[in-house]
């Protein structure tokens, strides 16, 4: 029970921070405002985060929360390829509507230069676990190719998804991310399907 409350506290801080970052911008948001918005304490904040900059890496875990929300909506017998498209569409819509593009750009740049934690590559995240589960099921169903290992296909999917996000950041959000993904992502991951 205590572990669940700790996770809930951290989640409240992360959600409040990203809400404020989106509304006010990263630079104009203070730690004090995050604490107030989250309804937590200064001690709780600094228990989880060294400072505001540490919250940039939490975006990956915010994405995981979206996957945790979506997972129960996926039928066990659903076509795995279609499920992958669904997850991508839902995630990128959430990012486009709630994540400040400047912050996403900052996250990607810090992931490229950091020597510490790189949450986008953490295979213990819900993101990677769910992808492994879906791709394994797809191989068992015969809808996703079985001549490649599950982890290779997971890596490929993640690489394609990051490509869409990175390109959107490079172009400074000049187009709809979700519409671009709707058009391009099926082509990008079509090679994961079983060849007929």
Segments (PLM) and residue ranges:
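Hydrophobic alpha-helical connector segments
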Residues: 58, 72-98, 150, 154-157
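Short hydrophobic/aromatic patch on the recognition helix
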Residues: 39-49
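Amphipathic C-terminal alpha-helical segment
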Residues: 93-97, 128, 133, 137, ...
